[in-house]
Amino acid sequence: MNQSNCIVAQSGGPTVAINASLAGVIAGVKSSEKYDICYGAVNGILGILNENYLNLSDIFADDANLEKLKTTPAMYLGSCRHKLPDYKDDDSPYVYIFHQFDKLSIKAFFYIGGNDSMDTVLKLSDYAKKINSDVKIIGIPKTIDNDLCMTDHTPGFGSAAKYIASSMLEIAHDTFIYAVKSVTIVEIMGRDAGWLTAASALARNEYNTAPQFIYLPEVDFDKDKFVADIKEALAHTNNVIVAVSEGIHDADGSYITSSKAACDQFGHQQLSGAGKALEFIVNENIGVKVRSVEVNVLQRCASHLASLTDIEESFAQGKKGVTIAAEGVTASMVCLKRISNDPYQVEYTYSAIKDIANEAKSVPRDWINDAGNDVKPELIEYLKPLIQGETAVAYKNGLPDYMDVSHLHKCN
């Protein structure tokens, strides 16, 4: 009987939950009668082009390692931001990739990633159809930005939202201690979609109203209105905390940043400095104590504060990818459909990759207040279930005990 194997890779920016999705793929292969060996390509699609593989079936033969993988941050297989050309312009990488699939007896390829990774899934799917390949191409979602279409929310977002809300509450406690007027601006990831920044509203409780203002890229930023907002708030409280997306822009579409940003291979500006830019505005126009805080990579790698709901759903979506591939599905991405909020229930399904790749899901305008400086209760209700539950992270010598990833930082 001919061997039937599969290969999985991770791509794009890391999250707390992407390794849980990888664990789900490995577990799905373990329990599948369809596939024999699960290979892992190191550093995304480049791992296939460079023939850099790991035998994940061997590495994770012990279920204890699989459990540890689920709570290990970032990407066990490493990542890349490599954009495949259109095969009509240059099919050489496609020829090579599918040659490697044949060489390894690959019958399914799973790509765990966000928008740009789904572009790769679409291109490989189209090429597979062109050459009548029987390799199933499946996308497994991942992004803290929560901007993938056709799915209720994305793996990694819930944990990042939990970290953002927790950090916002802790920052609020830090500011409460001084009886002086102050403004704290917290810059949160989100180039085109403000889901993560919106999650800062979850920090509000019976004694904390921070953040008092939330500015998202879905609404044009107005400097004069921002200054007026802050002045009005300072008339009623000593401490004002602002949550701002890194991708806020003015009515002309120009980003509000403190410096000119470079672009990655997919043409996305690598933004930073929105918080610092707002700090300058407050300093020049209001003159109170002001500081900006850039949460940066911490929001996407804090496994010690992961959402159990997020980890469990991410694992299940990895397994679902294996299931649908074994059933003959291809050119698709695993999706979540929300059934209800209370009790919180979801259904695992899938959608055609052509309806997902190169599209983006923004925060609905009717979930943002009319003033454009806060979110509505509907968004809070959407977010709440996603941050529930805590994971049991193993500790060693007082620190989290994660999977060894020394294979990722060896010199080439």
Where are these predicted regions, by residue range?
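Gly-rich Lys/Arg/Thr-decorated short loops/hinges at beta-loop-alpha junctions or inter-strand turns
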Residues: 2-8, 69-83, 142-152, 179-182, ...
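Short, ordered loop/turn segments at secondary-structure junctions
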Residues: 11-13, 41-46, 81-82, 114-115, ...
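C-terminal non-catalytic interaction/assembly regions of soluble proteins
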Residues: 255-412
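Accessory alpha-helical/coil subdomains and C-terminal extensions
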Residues: 38, 100, 108-113, 119-132, ...
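Glycine-rich oxoanion-binding loops at beta->alpha junctions
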Residues: 52-107, 116, 155-157, 169
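Short glycine/serine/threonine-rich phosphate/pyrophosphate-binding segments
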Residues: 15-25, 48-49, 93-95, 115-123, ...
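N-terminal phosphate-binding or glycine-rich loops at protein starts, especially the Walker A/P-loop
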Residues: 1-54
